[in-house]
Amino acid sequence: MIQFMTKLNVADNTGAKQVGVIKVLGGTKRRYASVGDIVVVSVKKAQPDGIVRKGQVCKAVIVRVKKNITRSSGNSLSFDDNACVIIKEDKTPRGSRIFGPVARELRDKGFSKIVSLAPEVL
């Protein structure tokens, strides 16, 4: 579960390495985010030659979470880290590459471009 002030790894090549969650989008009392949810983030650590800079505020979609994801088939899935991909307003990634596996739930939520760029979909 991702909430306010959670630190996330960035799984793309925008230059950001770590971001902090400012807001979980989707309602006034929404507290937690999981795979496929959009959050507003602030860049905490970044490479000097990247697309985004430290302190920049942008939107991101969650692609991996440590907490178990239970599917309708009864299977559960969890990852080793909490990670996100920085996106534009039209739900397309700002970077051109995705690092590491992503969850299949992203395809159902309309992030097919991220799924197609990912090296592995679980």
UniProtKB/Swiss-Prot annotation:
NCBIfam families: rplN_bact (TIGR01067). One of its GO terms (biological process) is translation. The gene is rplN. Part of the 50S ribosomal subunit. Forms a cluster with proteins L3 and L19. In the 70S ribosome, L14 and L19 interact and together make contacts with the 16S rRNA in bridges B5 and B8. The keyword Repressor does not apply. This is Large ribosomal subunit protein uL14. Signal peptide: none annotated. Belongs to the universal ribosomal protein uL14 family. The keyword rRNA-binding applies. It comes from the Bacteria. It comes from Malacoplasma penetrans (strain HF-2) (Mycoplasma penetrans). Binds to 23S rRNA. Forms part of two intersubunit bridges in the 70S ribosome. GO terms for molecular function: large ribosomal subunit rRNA binding; structural constituent of ribosome. GO terms for cellular component: cytosolic large ribosomal subunit. Keywords: Ribonucleoprotein, Ribosomal protein, RNA-binding, rRNA-binding.
